[in-house]
Amino acid sequence: MRFDASQPLPEAYRGAIIALGNFDGFHLGHQAVARAAVDWARAEGRPAIIATFDPHPVRYFKPDALPFRLTTLDQREELFAQAGADAMLVFAFDDALASTTATEFVHDLLVARLGAAGVVTGEDFTFGKARGGNVGVLADLGATENLRVRAIGPVLLGGEVVSSSLIRDALSSEIIVPSNPANTFLESAG
């Protein structure tokens, strides 16, 4: 199930725990955030939603940058479902979202429009106009809105933080990892 974040969620999905991030590539770090959100939602009998941005904010701010998308929305929707999410939520990254302050993002979107009960992000998550919000700001704003916030630390592989940038760099360098021909950075959600 896919929802557009510009619209209110159906009543059955309000009160969800939302994993929030770009989730391009859905690597081990992304999976840790998703798993925490799904586990939290299941423990409380709530829907689990994984939210993503399209286009990627970098693509919005630098439209002429080389292609770097690791997964399409359709692929992410399938991966999110395999991870246990009840739905995928897509924030259209456009002029309106780019000009939304951190406070507006939390109050107007996460709380008022989507009715989120909790949000899980990575520790490095930033949001809002000019990246005005981070996990600390999200937690502070959430506390005033009865929105609970959890942050998940980085996942290390071979001593390096697993990230979409690391994967893109490996792909652009044509690095092959013979010990794991399937994909060093991805893990089956099943």
Question: Can you say where each PLM-predicted feature lies in the sequence?
Answer:
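Nucleotidyltransferase catalytic core that binds NTPs
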Residues: 1-190
